[in-house]
Amino acid sequence: MHPSTASAPVPARAAVVIVGGGVLGASIAFHLAEAGVAGVLLLERDRPAAGSSGKPIGGVRAQFSDPLNIRIGRRSLEAWRAFGERPGADIGLASVGYLFLLGDATERGLFAAGVAAQNALGVPSRLIGPAEAAALCPYLDPDRILAAAYCPTDGYALPGAAVTGYLRAAVRRGAAVRTHCPVTAIETSGGTVRAVRTPHGTVRTGAVICCAGAWSAEVGAMAGVRLPVTPVRRQIAFTGPLHPAPPRIPFTLDFATTAYFHNDGADGLLLGMSDPRQKPGFGREFSREWLEPFRAAVARRAPALAAVPVSHGWAGLYETTPDNNALIGESADAGRFLYATGFSGHGFLQAPAVGELVRDLYLGREPFLDVGPLAATRFEGRAGKGGTAGGGPRGDRPEAHII
């Protein structure tokens, strides 16, 4: 059961209001409460993990092209492995590794550079040949790939369990959670956050942290802050029990098409793919039209799975940004409006480290890395509060290893 209190009134005051009850908001609530911050209030418009964090299984990895993402991913992996002790919950972590399938020299070169950057930061990834890739994942046809990138410490876990674990630990440390409590307005005065309005009352507060996922642009606008986040539907499907049961395999994905698959329990597979035809929007109904391009894509690498049966599926939202990198920082335009959103599919895996980062931004501590390059204003060529812009011509920094 989620540690929610839908029927309780909102408090009249809070030191900090977190908007969004997904894994990012839950992690931040835990890290703030653990640090001794009194008056932490998390508001969720629906129920915890109702948005992007509701995905049944979420990948965790440190294989990225951007050094910032590598560092955040590695630190988060350490926290996921220790989650049973801190904050104390079973998240079903399966450290089966990630296996990126590469079909040509250009892809191999891109991942060779990524592996070099990852190794320099302590991530044990490596490039492997087709035979070794097929040994790790027997569904693969080694004649249909050129190489693969593999990291044995990557894997997947259960987002819902992580959200519940974080929130329960936060509540034990004094945080408050209100569900079915959407934020309808944010009051500012003198360039600083003053209050948050909800259908259940107004909360006077000196700080707001936006973790509203696909709805973050709307929340930011309430405070006069531009958060360039666009919602896009993503879908996954499940085979149900297979006979014979699948072997234990890595989280395996074809880089060119984003088609991926991995174990789902003991006897089935989870299937997924980013459909390039999908238009932005908030629709979350599951449909099967994407399975046709998925089957065509998987036939290129693992022909044995091209006709695998599908029993059911799930649809959720990616919160995307123009460069597929997160928005993390504090607004220079609305004092004490912080944000952690726009993760473009890697929010779950980065949640532990992001909780640390936002905690330190809120407390004025030196974070373990400079998040200035992830400021929402990078697309305008401006740095976030207390950081540097960096990146591309506008300050953007495209992430290549996106699913």
What residue spans do the PLM features occupy?
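Helical element adjacent to the flavin cofactor pocket in flavoenzyme catalytic cores
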Residues: A149-G206
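Active-site substrate-recognition segment that forms the wall
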Residues: F30-E34, G58-V60, A82, A89-G97, ...
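A short, basic/flexible loop-to-alpha-helix module at the beginning of a structural domain
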Residues: M1-R13
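Glycine-rich FAD pyrophosphate-binding loop
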Residues: A33-G54
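Flavin (FAD/FMN) cofactor-binding core of flavoprotein oxidoreductases
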Residues: A131-C137, Y156, E289-E366, G372-G384
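Dinucleotide-binding Rossmann-like beta1-alpha1 core, especially the glycine-rich loop
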Residues: I57-L136, T258-Y260, A297-A299
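Short beta-strand to alpha-helix junction loop
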Residues: R71-R74, L102-G109, Y150-R168, E285-E292
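Beta1/beta-strand and adjacent pyrophosphate-binding region of the FAD-binding site
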Residues: V10-L24, L41
